[in-house]
């Protein structure tokens, strides 16, 4: 029998945001957590033999476990807290941050039980929780936090934007860490809740131990879980961290089973070889949901998401530098048909880059192009295109308008059918589209490195990453490198204004102008706002969706029963 659970909109706490402008902000309290070269051999991980005595309060049944389907190898051997390697979901299970993201987007205590922010927003002082240990039994202290931050800040490839503004990092005493910046940056606390690269790793996790420049050896965090074993491209086994400071997991073990093929994940759910699948862990094909909903052993959980799927344009292509062509592509896409006919009514038509579950996105600034194919044809004509040879494809100076459309389906199985529909719709207005389906690694190389595409379907980030982190990552230059999706100096100036002001009204105004400019210049093609779908075996008890995509499930609460 199918059960539908709706998650509340994830939004910023306006009270918290306004408080950033006050002289001092103190938040205190206790918060339970909710949460390379490879070979095919099995590798053992976990607490070492010479670790200190296991604590007595490690409660739970040592025989309780579940198996979770994941779409890609979790990369346990690369799971450095200070790097963008391995599974983001597993990062969040093994490592804790100083703070965590709450149900309504509020920032809650985690490893830091309280903190203060200076009046000018440039100095943050964090007070660490007492008695916290890493999974190897060593103590969490300010030196370990300093080590962790120095590890990711030193590497531009792994660093967040705020790293360039950090002037000093000081361990004031054993449980106090102070960070000083050369400018105010409102999203800093939110970024500290990210799964990576800001979470805290034990100094003994690298060689030589305690060296920020040391080589990563093993994932040692303060989180509720630690890696016990790992077989590349097959599975990873996570077990309870016996030293965990928060709510003790009810399960003793979580097995992450790598199943790249979406239909194979469906079969594994049906035959009981996996207990849970879905979301960013490993998408469930929409066309399989009716069958799964009728399965009496399974439950389907649905939640409104905070991301969107969209088409990125390659601005290096002279054809796509013409705003009329970009607008025509937008007007040719029937977003209602995508949601109703392809997605089975799951999700919503996109009205911009972000849904209104994202902070600063409002009804007023959510304006986008409708389905107007005749208007699209007229815009192509204004851009100088016509079908001179009667083959149904428009051309200009004898050159047909042909675009290469790149996608992948391992992580997002619906993208292939969406791509085929858009291909057909663009042909209807005279654009020839060639689809290219790539494996995930090749796909991401194409997006981030080679840019060997004209159109590529991608998704925004989720939850705490929106809107600022996604805009900085994809629509803003990094150093001398141009923006990944679309380069525009005026847009970048607006993004800088949004993230640099501590005034809430100024920030909202900056975001309004960002979204307006994106619409006017059709910097991308909006497609749809997906819902998150999970399928769970009914033997799994206490299932509850998490507040972020990197913690999609409250793992510590899960239990099993007959």
Question: What is each of the regions a protein language model found here?
Answer:
Residues 116, 161-206:
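Surface-exposed binding/hinge segments that line
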Residues 106, 194-249, 253, 373-374, ...:
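Gly/Pro-rich hinge or "lid" segments in bacterial periplasmic/extracellular proteins
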Residues 113-155, 178, 319:
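Aromatic- and charge-enriched surface segment that lines or borders ligand/interaction sites
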Residues 18, 25, 231, 235, ...:
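Detector for C-terminal structural segments
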Residues 69-119, 150, 220, 549:
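N-terminal lobe/hinge region of extracytoplasmic solute-binding protein
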Residues 1-65, 106-109, 161, 168, ...:
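Short, low-complexity disordered leader/linker segments with a strong preference
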Residues 169, 228-242, 255-317, 324-328, ...:
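Extracellular/periplasmic solute-recognition and catalytic clefts
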